[in-house]
């Protein structure tokens, strides 16, 4: 077993305590945490009431004192005007604006469960999630209001954020409502988020106050975040990175959050430049797009720390980012919705680490192990499925017993190994391992070599059915702007670097690699593209 408290305890002071929860679950968490995320907001407001808490891309600015006032007003309105109560399931389908942040914190105060819905989904996809989540209320942007009219028992509140005052102020008598006492508690669920995948297979992940608080405290300790830090949120707030690793972390730490409704690389970089932003956390795809704007923003001296999660970051891209921002530390992160974001973090600056290609070591309060197909724990260097247990692991899946989470140990579905020093190397999703005639291929091995070829911006390798070998690897490639590379040139390069059976039998090009709503490469969709096109060719 690999214990985060031991591995990080050698590097930084860790004020950890052991707690037993009401369900008998034992966790190791940080001392003196507030009871709820709303309590974290109050603590930050008490320390720095006049500090900027949120500024959004509509020009609206809220200090911590003002943010508490707005959250209290909206929570009171939801209770008195809409009869909302603790435990109610409330859909949130808002873009990344001040309204989203205030609504989320108001729901935490009430003790309601925020069911965060992806704004990139289509109506049919949202329908499947709404039916599974047992929603009683929906708070949405007016762009989506009509989608919910067919649900007769669903109370709908819609808004369109705009320049000027909060749209919540248009609600009747919001100023006249009596302030309510906080209803939420440490162990209460606060969020339901859906895993990526097809809507029929998406799992509703239930996260509690203590999950969010531990995740925030761990990030703060590992990245040395203080109230002097600031972050722009370059990813949607319906993703766990946006909601926990950025919004939750900075409310907890008392820093400043810059919220954008939509991602545009130049807009994010201009915000960093003009607002002197110090921290950013994003997926590899975001960093790829930011690198394309390098020439417009050659120096960003305020940035001190970058984190990258969602999927593996290639060595070549890390080196490019270091060339661009040599003063800035870069840390890889491995986690998932079920871990409330953080699972492992590379403790040292990636460019200086001999473990640059790893995902780091377990965060304080988490324990990891590697097991074989029979559940037997494996030793360092042996490859198997990654399992994790600890304080920021979800309460469970909503209305689903998947068998993935038993005795507080979660099967991640990822294949990898640990070194003797406790560094985690994630090799592939278990379901994405390619079996070509009995020879196992990890897609990451092939992708890493593809990224060595100049001009390749993004690459995805998947397995598709083959009459003789069972499966064969194929590759989808996205080239950099104004670059031309042929499939023949790519194949010739791979022949020099890889065993013959690992070389993709087919290479296709695309203008944009398909992504899931959570910002990860959508290998299921890519596999479907190859299979369907192959069927068309045989007709």
Model feature map: region roles:
Residues 18-19, 143-186:
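ANL superfamily adenylate-forming
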Residues 33, 42, 50-97, 101-105, ...:
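Conserved AMP-binding/adenylate-forming core of the ANL superfamily
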Residues 68-76, 205-226, 234, 244, ...:
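Conserved structural elements of the adenylate-forming
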Residues 111, 213-230, 240-278, 293:
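Conserved AMP-binding/adenylation subdomain of ANL enzymes
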Residues 277-282, 292-354:
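Gly/Ser/Thr-rich phosphate-binding loop
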Residues 280, 390, 396, 415-502, ...:
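AMP-binding/adenylate-forming catalytic core of the ANL superfamily
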Residues 361-365, 376-407, 439-441:
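Conserved ATP/PPi-binding loop(s) of AMP-dependent carboxylate-activating enzymes
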């Amino acid at each position: 077993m690999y214990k985060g408290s031991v591995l990080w305890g050698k590097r930084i002071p860790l004020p950890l305590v052991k707690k037993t929860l009401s369900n008998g679950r034992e966790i190791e968490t940080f001392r003196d945490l507030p009871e709820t995320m709303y309590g974290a907001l109050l603590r930050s407001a008490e320390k720095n009431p006049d500090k900027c808490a949120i500024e959004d891309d509509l020009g609206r600015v809220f200090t911590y004192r003002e943010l508490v006032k707005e959250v209290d007003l909206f929570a009171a309105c939801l209770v008195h005007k809409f009869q909302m109560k603790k435990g109610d399931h409330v859909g949130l389908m808002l873009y990344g604006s001040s309204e989203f942040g205030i609504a989320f914190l108001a729901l935490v105060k009430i003790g309601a469960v925020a069911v965060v819905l992806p704004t990139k989904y289509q109506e049919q996809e949202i329908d499947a999630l709404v039916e599974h989540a047992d929603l009683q209320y929906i708070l949405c942007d007016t762009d989506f209001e009509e989608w919910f009219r067919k649900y007769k028992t669903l109370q709908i509140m819609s808004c369109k954020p705009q320049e000027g005052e909060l749209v919540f102020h248009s609600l009747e008598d919001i100023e006249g409502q009596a302030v309510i006492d906080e209803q939420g508690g440490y162990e209460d669920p606060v969020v339901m988020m859906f895993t990526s995948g097809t809507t029929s297979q998406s799992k509703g992940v239930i996260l509690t106050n203590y999950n969010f608080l531990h995740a925030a405290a761990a990030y703060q300790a590992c990245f040395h975040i203080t109230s002097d830090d600031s972050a722009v949120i370059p990813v949607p707030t319906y993703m766990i990175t946006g909601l926990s690793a950025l919004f939750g972390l900075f409310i907890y730490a008392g820093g400043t959050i810059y919220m954008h409704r939509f991602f545009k690389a130049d807009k994010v970089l201009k915000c960093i430049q003009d607002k002197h932003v110090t921290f950013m956390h994003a997926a590899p795809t975001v960093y790829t797009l930011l690198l394309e704007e390098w020439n417009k923003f050659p120096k960003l001296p305020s940035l001190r720390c970058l984190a990258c999660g969602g999927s593996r970051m290639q060595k070549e891209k890390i080196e490019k980012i270091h060339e661009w921002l040599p003063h800035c530390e870069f840390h890889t992160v491995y986690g998932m919705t079920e871990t409330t974001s953080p699972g492992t973090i590379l403790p040292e600056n990636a460019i200086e680490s001999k473990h640059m290609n790893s995902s780091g070591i377990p965060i304080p309060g988490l324990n990891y192990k590697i097991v074989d197909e029979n559940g037997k724990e494996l030793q360092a260097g042996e490859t198997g499925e990654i399992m994790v247990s600890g304080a920021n692991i979800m309460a469970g899946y909503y209305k689903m017993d998947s068998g993935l989470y038993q005795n507080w140990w979660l099967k991640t579905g990822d294949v990898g190994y640990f070194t003797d020093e406790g560094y985690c190397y994630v090799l592939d999703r278990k379901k994405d391992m390619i079996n070509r005639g009995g020879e196992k291929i990890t897609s990451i091995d092939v992708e890493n070599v593809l990224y060595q070829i100049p001009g390749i911006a993004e690459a995805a390798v998947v397995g598709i059915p083959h009459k003789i070998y069972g499966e064969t690897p194929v590759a989808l490639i996205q080239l950099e702007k104004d670059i031309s590379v042929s499939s023949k040139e790519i194949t010739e390069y791979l022949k020099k670097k890889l065993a013959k059976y690992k070389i993709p039998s087919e290479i296709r090009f695309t203008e944009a690699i398909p992504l899931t709503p959570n910002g990860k490469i959508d290998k299921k969709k890519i596999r479907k593209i190859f299979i369907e096109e192959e069927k068309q060719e045989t007709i």
